[in-house]
């Protein structure tokens, strides 16, 4: 019985492999057309509400350095299941670009996450983020163009755009993050400089051709601040695009700041210190008025507009009048509020949580009313109870993908007419990513989950029989598939190189031609990318 069971499992593994080959062929065969993609307005109409994978891919040098594990298919599927139709992937590039050239391994790493999002059926925004505090671009918006910055903008976006040129309209590029955080007063020269860099971004992407000729692109407001943008960046200042109707505009929303982000008392020149605020809307605490959202230390009273939906409505109405109505769809690329778990407990924490539900619902309601796409900021730091956090979907502990604040998510879902949240689980295989091929609609790449998506490098792996190994090699050669993993062995039709997710070379196969093998025993825990020819394969070593 044991032998028959073993052969049955072997046959099932081979059948599963052949199914994946068939899927790969389908993915490669579905070539995207260079015909015009849907316009920005058409794209935005399907974006619903969105979710940020924050504090991850934008971390300089190492996407796991700030405590979040590398994004997985399980996470992206969970984002979709929670009711989000869009995901924003903040991303670092400069720290992965020695000599100005982005490493191919980092491009493959980013592609892996983009492919996860595509398989989950999500509209996907990929940007150049801040690369640390300020970075090479964000805090360097001067009154004249810096040629080094301009060159980087062109080089990076040319490389990024070429990597993704065949992806469909569900992939969107965003030029920056929050440009100019150090500028208190934007002059026309500052605005002109920023718009010049955006022109470089747009021209670089369009020049790569393919679907990038009409891909939706996003430019950011002045520090993504609503009032600064309205005051100093009207559409007349915008860069020019070769095609009409393919640009979006981005702002962020964290109002009132004392409620959403402030973590310590500040002295801003009022007659009393400015304190963090914990209670919002209908859930304010009468015995602590200074802790209520909208409390004005200069006036000694709560500004009722800041304590309810009137403020986001007023702000988002400005976006509609100044940008949406003039042909530029608007996304609220980030919004969110810290949960005050270190400071509050008991009934105070419950009151705070009730107010959080109302705040998130108010923001999403106002955004939808004025035709904006709201995208929730998530830092993924739910496992750290020592400071305020902004984590809505679990990333750092099991089960990955669990919604942490169901009441908040359900309030947001309700605005879009969705029912209460139900976890639908993982529906995709994670370890088969064809290098160089396009990811079409998610239904084309959905296959049942398999235990083969991870390996345990320290565990004993039953050796493949010589006949099954020969059969596998024959299938690999006959189908043109250049890279596959069985157990703790990679098989390829040329030299195999193995990298960690930061682009460091880990090991290579000895041969550079013909059928090759690479053993995986002894790897440290983590995620790896194997490459053979134009094929890439990502896997997890536990």
Predicted feature residues:
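Short, Lys/Arg-enriched N-terminal segments with co-localized hydrophobic residues
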Residues: 2-13
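C-terminal outer-membrane/trafficking sorting elements
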Residues: 5-6, 455-542
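Hydrophobic h-region of N-terminal signal peptides that target proteins for export
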Residues: 25-34
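Active-site mouth of glycoside hydrolases
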Residues: 38-216, 220-232, 383, 395-416
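Anion (oxyanion) recognition and catalysis
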Residues: 118, 324, 364, 368
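Aromatic-rich peripheral "rim/lid" segments of glycoside hydrolase catalytic domains that contact
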Residues: 342-439
């Amino acid at each position: 019985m044991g032998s028959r069971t073993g052969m049955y499992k072997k046959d099932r593994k081979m059948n599963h492999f052949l199914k994946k080959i068939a899927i790969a062929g389908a993915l490669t065969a579905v070539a995207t057309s260079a015909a015009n993609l849907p316009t920005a307005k058409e794209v935005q109409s399907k974006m619903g509400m969105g979710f940020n994978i924050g504090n991850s891919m934008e971390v300089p040098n190492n996407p796991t350095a700030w405590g979040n594990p590398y994004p997985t298919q399980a996470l992206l599927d969970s984002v979709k299941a929670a009711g989000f139709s869009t995901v924003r992937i903040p991303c670092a590039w400069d720290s992965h670009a020695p000599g100005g050239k982005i490493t191919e391994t980092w491009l493959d790493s980013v592609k892996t996450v983009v492919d996860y999002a595509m398989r989950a059926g999500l509209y996907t925004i990929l940007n150049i983020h801040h690369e640390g505090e300020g970075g090479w671009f964000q805090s360097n918006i001067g009154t004249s163009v810096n040629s080094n910055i301009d060159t980087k903008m062109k080089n990076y976006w040319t490389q990024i755009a070429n990597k993704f040129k065949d992806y469909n309209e569900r992939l969107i590029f965003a030029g920056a993050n929050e440009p100019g955080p150090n500028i208190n007063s934007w002059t026309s020269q500052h605005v002109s400089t920023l718009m010049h860099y955006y022109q470089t971004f747009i021209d670089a992407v369009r020049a790569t051709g393919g679907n990038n000729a009409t891909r939706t692109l996003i430019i950011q407001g002045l520090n993504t601040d609503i009032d600064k943008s309205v005051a100093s960046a009207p559409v007349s200042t915008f860069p020019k695009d070769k095609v009409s109707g393919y640009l979006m505009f981005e702002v962020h929303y964290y109002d009132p700041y004392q409620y959403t982000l402030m973590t310590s008392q500040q002295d801003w020149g009022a007659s009393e210190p400015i304190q963090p605020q914990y209670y919002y809307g209908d859930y304010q605490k009468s015995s602590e008025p200074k802790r209520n959202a909208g409390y004005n230390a200069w006036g000694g009273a709560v500004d009722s507009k800041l304590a309810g939906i009137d403020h986001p409505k007023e702000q988002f109405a400005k976006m509609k009048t100044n940008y949406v109505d003039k042909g530029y769809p608007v996304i609220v690329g980030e919004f969110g509020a810290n949960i005050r778990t270190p400071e509050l407990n008991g009934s105070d924490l419950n009151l705070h949580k009730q107010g959080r539900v109302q705040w998130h619902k108010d923001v999403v309601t106002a955004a939808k009313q004025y035709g904006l796409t709201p995208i929730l900021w998530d830092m993924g730091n739910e496992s750290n109870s020592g400071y305020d956090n902004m984590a809505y979907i679990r990333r750092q502990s099991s089960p990955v993908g669990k919604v942490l604040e169901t009441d908040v998510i359900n309030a947001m879902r309700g605005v879009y007419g969705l029912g209460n949240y139900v976890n639908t689980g993982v529906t995709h295989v994670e370890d088969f990513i064809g290098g160089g091929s396009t990811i079409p609609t998610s239904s084309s790449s959905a296959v049942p989950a398999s235990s083969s998506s991870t390996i345990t490098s320290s565990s004993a792996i039953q050796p493949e029989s010589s006949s099954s190994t020969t059969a596998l090699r024959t299938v690999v050669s006959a189908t043109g598939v250049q890279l596959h993993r069985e157990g703790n062995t990679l098989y390829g039709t040329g030299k195999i190189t193995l990298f960690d997710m930061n682009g460091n070379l880990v090991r290579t196969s000895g041969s550079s031609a013909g059928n090759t093998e690479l053993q995986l025993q002894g790897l440290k825990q983590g995620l790896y990318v194997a490459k053979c020819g134009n094929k890439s394969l990502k896997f997890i070593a536990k």
